C-alpha cells in the first residue's frame, strides 16, 4: 500500500511519464493500492489533518478492525473538535479527498 500527498501528485505524474516501468513494477500500483493523503504540512503542521489521515490509513490498511469507522465522518469529528468547524467538504471540492489514486492519470 502506498499513500501519496496530493500536493506532490504533479511531480509524481511527471516522473511517471519519464519512468513508467519503475512505477508499474511496484506491487501497490499493480494491485491498485495507491491512496490519497490530504496534505497536513504547509507552512506549519496541521495536527487535525494528520490525525484524519491516520484514521483513513488505518481504515485502508486494517478494514476489519476499522469497519465501524467512516474516515470522512471521523475527519469531520476531528476537524470540528480541533478547529470548531468541518472543512472536509471544502477540501474535497478543491480536489483533496480520501480516495484511491491512479498514478500517471
List where the protein language model places each region.
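Binding-cleft/active-site segments that stabilize strongly anionic ligands or cofactors
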Residues: 1-51, 65-67, 73, 77, ...
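Extracytoplasmic/secreted envelope proteins and their assembly/folding machinery
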Residues: 51-58
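Short, hydrophobic alpha-helical segments
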Residues: 58-65
Amino acid at each position: 500500500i502506498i499513500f501519496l500527498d496530493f500536493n506532490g501528485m504533479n511531480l509524481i505524474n511527471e516522473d511517471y511519464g519519464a519512468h513508467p516501468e519503475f512505477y508499474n513494477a511496484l506491487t501497490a500500483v499493480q494491485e491498485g493500492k495507491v491512496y490519497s493523503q490530504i496534505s497536513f504540512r504547509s507552512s506549519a503542521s496541521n495536527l487535525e489533518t494528520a490525525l484524519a489521515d491516520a484514521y483513513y490509513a488505518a481504515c485502508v490498511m486494517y478494514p476489519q478492525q476499522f469497519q465501524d469507522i467512516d474516515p470522512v465522518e471521523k475527519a469531520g469529528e476531528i476537524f470540528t473538535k480541533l478547529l470548531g468547524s468541518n472543512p472536509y467538504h471544502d477540501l474535497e471540492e478543491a480536489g483533496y479527498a480520501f480516495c484511491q489514486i491512479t498514478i500517471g492519470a
